[in-house]
A protein has these predicted regions:
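Bacterial N-terminal signal peptides that target proteins for export
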Residues: 1-8
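Bacterial N-terminal signal peptides
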Residues: 8-18
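Boundary at the C-terminal end of the N-terminal hydrophobic targeting segment
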Residues: 20-25
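Vicinal oxygen chelate
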Residues: 26-30, 37-45, 89-97, 114-131, 133-181
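Catalytic phosphate/metal-binding cores of nucleic-acid and nucleotide-processing enzymes, i.e., regions
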Residues: 34
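Amphipathic alpha-helical segments
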Residues: 46-61, 135-142
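A cross-kingdom feature marking solvent-exposed beta-strand/loop segments within repeated
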Residues: 67-80, 84, 107-115, 122, ...
Length: 181
């Protein structure tokens, strides 16, 4: 039952503006600060093919595809251990939400793990957070441990994936931009 509390809070915060910021909601659900979905990410085996197809469906140009820096350069960890994993990424800006396509490169990432276990499909919902430590504490208290984290390639923020697959069917990502370079 506890695991459904956070899902209820997230759905309510999306559907009923102001509810999640009320004192009652914060107290009952430990308010992890997941107020705004900014990203839906899909893991794929072939990012070139997938990005062309998504561009056709969305009626948009194919965005640039880039390869992330090796994990050791961005302080990446996977399941608590340093990782040198990488990914090819592309982003479709859809207004208030970004569609991210991810093709894992190498081992040691949640991207590769989920692609191997479940095949192509939704990897995570990305939420913008103000306080990543608060989000981590709250989500871990809900039973969602950190599975994978690191810094942006631009070194001006962090991403943290929480293992919420079993009860929510998808990972939760907390995205925090700290503005430093």
């Amino acid at each position: 039952m506890k695991r459904f509390g956070i899902l209820s809070a997230m759905i309510c915060s999306l559907l009923v503006p102001g509810l999640a910021s009320s004192g009652a909601a914060r107290e009952k659900y430990h308010d992890p600060g997941l107020k705004k979905v900014i990203q839906i990410a899909i893991v794929v085996r072939d990012i070139e093919t997938a990005s062309r197809r998504w561009a056709e469906v969305l009626g948009m140009p194919v965005p640039e595809i880039r390869t992330t820096r090796p994990g050791h350069e961005v302080k990446m960890t996977y399941r608590g251990r340093p990782s040198d994993g990488q990914a090819k990424l592309t982003f479709f800006n859809l207004g208030q939400v970004v569609l991210e396509l991810i093709q894992p490169v190498g081992e040691g990432t949640s991207w590769k793990e989920i692609l191997d276990k479940r095949g192509e499909g939704v990897h995570h919902l990305g939420f913008q957070v103000v306080d990543p430590d608060k989000a981590s504490q709250s989500l871990e208290r809900e039973g969602f441990p950190v599975i994978h984290k690191g810094r942006y390639d631009s070194d001006d923020g962090t991403y943290i994936y929480f293992d919420s697959q079993k009860s929510l069917g998808v990972l939760i990502e907390a995205l925090h931009s700290d503005g430093r370079k």
